[in-house]
C-alpha cells in the first residue's frame, strides 16, 4: 500500500528586494522519487524557477506549477520595498508518483532594508541683490523623518539659515551644514550685483537617520536688476 509523502513546512527570513533561494523539503517512507509543485502563490512578492539555486528562471505565475530544478529549489523576492512578518508565504505539495501530500506552507518573513532618501532636484529664480527663500525637498519610501544638510556652497552668493522663512540667520559658510529650520528653508542672496543662469547653484543631501542621499543640485538663476 502506498504511503503518502509528507511535505515539510518551514520558516525562512529574507531581506527586502534581495533574492532568497529556498529549498523545498519532503519525505517519503517508501523512498519514492518526489515531485514538488507550488500550490499557492506568495501572498506578496514573486517566485521563480531556478536551474542552479541562484539564477532566476521563469516566474511562477499559476498553480499548480511543478518545480523544474532537481534540487527542488525556488527563488523568492519581495515586491519592491515590501517587508513584514508572513509577508511572502506560499504553499507547496509533494507527489510520490501516485498521490499528492497535504499542502505545506513556507512562511517568509521579509526584513526591512533601509532605502536611501532621494533629494529633489529643483530650479529657482531669484532677483539680483534680493533675498530668496528656498524650500529644500526630498522623499523617502520608508517614511523616515528626514534632516537636510548643505553639501556644496553656492557658486556665487550666500546662503543663510532661517527660523521663519524670511529673516536671515547664521550664514552657512562650511559644508556639510545641517539646515536648522524644521520646514527645511534657507535664504539665498546673490553676490553684490551678480546675476546669471546658474549663478547661485548649491548642493544638498537628505538624511533618513541612517544614511545620506546622493547630492542634489539646486539651480539658482538670478535675474539682473532693471535699472532706472
Segments the model singles out, each with a brief description of its role:
Residues 3-9, 115-121, 226-228:
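Proline-enriched interdomain boundary motifs that mark the N-terminal boundary
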Residues 14-16, 21-33, 39-115, 126-131, ...:
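Acidic, turn/loop-rich segments in luminal/extracellular domains of secretory-pathway
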